[in-house]
């Protein structure tokens, strides 16, 4: 396949370097998750950067099917933690599991004025 744009490199090494050395402001966008079909129909957009207090559904991996609220977003590790998705340690303690947002689907948005402005800026519709 021919290269789509001459302005963007298709070199794997450069793409990986850009991903792993991205500043926090770009990592926010890289940590985006798709919206559920209902939210996609309601707001008219496909994906949003994930944030604390969004409700999500795990759609890939061993924890597939579990739901919960985002308890923390760890930009440095490209990971989010969901409050009900945990594993049990040998001593009986429960610890949260790090998940990548691409393996999640947002089922309920935490809306505030900034999030509403973002949806409108992306060309979405608010009810």
From Swiss-Prot:
Which GO biological process categories is it annotated with? Answer: cytoplasmic translation; ribosomal large subunit biogenesis
GO MF: RNA binding; structural constituent of ribosome
> Among its keywords, does the record have Protein transport?
no
Cellular component per GO? cytosol; cytosolic large ribosomal subunit
* Record carries keyword Cytoplasm: yes
Swiss-Prot/TrEMBL keywords: Cytoplasm, Ribonucleoprotein, Ribosomal protein
Q: Note the CDD domains from the entry.
A: KOW_RPL26
Subcellular location(s) per record: Cytoplasm
PANTHER family xref list: 60S RIBOSOMAL PROTEIN L26 FAMILY MEMBER
Report the protein's function: Component of the ribosome, a large ribonucleoprotein complex responsible for the synthesis of proteins in the cell. The small ribosomal subunit (SSU) binds messenger RNAs (mRNAs) and translates the encoded message by selecting cognate aminoacyl-transfer RNA (tRNA) molecules. The large subunit (LSU) contains the ribosomal catalytic site termed the peptidyl transferase center (PTC), which catalyzes the formation of peptide bonds, thereby polymerizing the amino acids delivered by tRNAs into a polypeptide chain.
The entry's other comment says: There are 2 genes for uL24 in yeast.
Q: How does it assemble?
A: Component of the large ribosomal subunit (LSU). Mature yeast ribosomes consist of a small (40S) and a large (60S) subunit. The 40S small subunit contains 1 molecule of ribosomal RNA (18S rRNA) and 33 different proteins (encoded by 57 genes). The large 60S subunit contains 3 rRNA molecules (25S, 5.8S and 5S rRNA) and 46 different proteins (encoded by 81 genes).
Q: Give the family this protein belongs to, as stated in its UniProt record.
A: Belongs to the universal ribosomal protein uL24 family.
Q: What is this protein called?
A: Large ribosomal subunit protein uL24A
Q: Organism, per UniProt?
A: Saccharomyces cerevisiae (strain ATCC 204508 / S288c)
């Amino acid at each position: 396949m021919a290269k789509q744009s001459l302005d963007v490199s298709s070199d794997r090494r450069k793409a990986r370097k850009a991903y792993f050395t991205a500043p926090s402001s770009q990592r926010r966008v890289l940590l985006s998750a798709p919206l559920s079909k209902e939210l996609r129909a309601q707001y008219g957009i496909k994906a949003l950067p994930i944030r604390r207090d969004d409700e999500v559904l795990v759609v890939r991996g061993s924890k597939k099917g579990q739901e919960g609220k985002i308890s923390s977003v760890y930009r440095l590790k490209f990971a989010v933690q969901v409050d009900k998705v945990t594993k049990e340690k040998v001593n009986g303690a429960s610890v949260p599991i790090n998940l990548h947002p691409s393996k999640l689907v947002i089922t309920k948005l935490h809306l505030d004025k900034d999030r509403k402005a973002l949806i409108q800026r992306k060309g979405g519709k608010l009810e």
